[in-house]
Amino acid sequence: MLSVKFLVALSWLSAAGQLVLAADIDWESIKNSRGDKLPDFSYCGYRSSDKSLPGSTAASVVVKASSGDRTKEIQAALDSTAASGGGVVELAAGTFRISPGLNISANTRLRGSGVESTTLDVTKLKTAGLPLLSMGNGTNGRIKPSFTSKITDKYVGIGAKTVTVEDGKQFAKGQTVFISRAATEKWVRQNGMADLVRDGEKQTWVPVGNLIQQPRTVQAVSGNKLTLDIPLTDALDQTYMEPYVAAYDLPETNPEIGIEDLSITLSPTCAGRVFNESEPCNAPAIQLNPWTVDSFVRNVNITGFNNCIDVQYNVSRITIENASFFRDRDTDRPGGYPTDINISGTQVLIKDSGQYGRKTAKAFTVITQARAPGPNAVLRHHIQSDLQELYPHQRWAHGFLVENTNANVMFVNRGTAGSGQGWPINAGVAWNVRGGVNVSSPPLGINWAIGSTGPVELVSNGTLVSNGTAVTPKSLYNAQRQKRKGTA
């Protein structure tokens, strides 16, 4: 049973100047019989969307264009700027030939003179997995908890902000924690993922024992009740799991890193090459390394890459804004499709970005990877071809918003695809999507499609609200942010 309050009918003007009729709904009232509510996506982005992206500041170093490979000169400028406390390394107008492996440290920005003026030109990706540009210096070593305490609530729904633990005395305000639970055989089986077989071979979805985590900070402690800074994006059900809170000491983070106002071109192109982990062509143009936080990529054009931006696990509070991805080659088949943006981190905000180039070059324009913790959000994403999809990729990511896009949105069971990618998303929300929508919900989860005006797959068990009619608020992200900041 779904609860939702419809208010009055409203309208707005679309970007094309057309009048869009909309149903005004109370988004806060949307919940199911278990008490699962829409996740709060207002915490996505740089500084949890509490601050604007940094403005234009004077450059610490200006590097001028010239012939030859400029990798060493640019890296030296980045290193000296970081060593002096941070600042902006500005690339003047022109073309800079570089090689993979440039790294940007904390408090340092690499800024061009505009996407039409400054181009980073690379002719070859050298080593499998070595990005052209990387942000931050962290690694994904295992984090050992300093202490843990079992959660005693029978059920904690999506959107909840409090949990009850056995021993609250151990916790304090400001403590960094993982809301954790290990995948159990009972949970895997109840979701229909225990007996996957492909070509006669058993496929494994989420291995039993693998942790599904939600990184949070304790906001308040009252007895054994903990209030968290961000509402949960995945439910906790004692029937199928043994959830607990794990406190940990935050490793050194890499904040305030930026890449902006430039183009990146790989020629000859790698776009669309058959996916192979040992193939250098699958190295990303930009990679945000673990524990990179409060950083951004904006006003960037990327051409010729198979995979463009990779946001790794334990990356958080990131904004990707006005990023354009140009596919200049058709996609090889058979083989996995390339991706524009790959999300394994949390609190990632992608806005006003899109994919261009060959309309026949099929790709996943934004994906989430295995167990990627929410919230993450994609706003106003544009694609030129209905071959492109916003498509959570594998193994129970959770808390993913897609709104106001013309792309196809797929929240569906991927079954034995890959090596058993199965249910890829829980607590996914498609809001005012104009492209095609196919939304299904896992047995122990829920995904929503609200205000869909494009073609909708009706033979599914996804939760559909106001199907065929757009809704107000036009942006769920903006409405939640205004509510949180008291400006609604």
Indicate residue ranges for each PLM-predicted region.
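Short, glycine/acidic-rich beta->alpha junctions
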Residues: 69-70, 94, 102, 157, ...
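Extracellular beta-rich repeat passengers
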Residues: 128, 266, 273-276, 299, ...
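Short, T/G/N/S-enriched strand-turn elements that build extracellular solenoid repeat scaffolds
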Residues: 74-82, 97-110, 120-123, 308-313, ...
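Extracellular "leader-to-stem" segments immediately downstream of a signal peptide or signal-anchor
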Residues: 2-276, 448-488
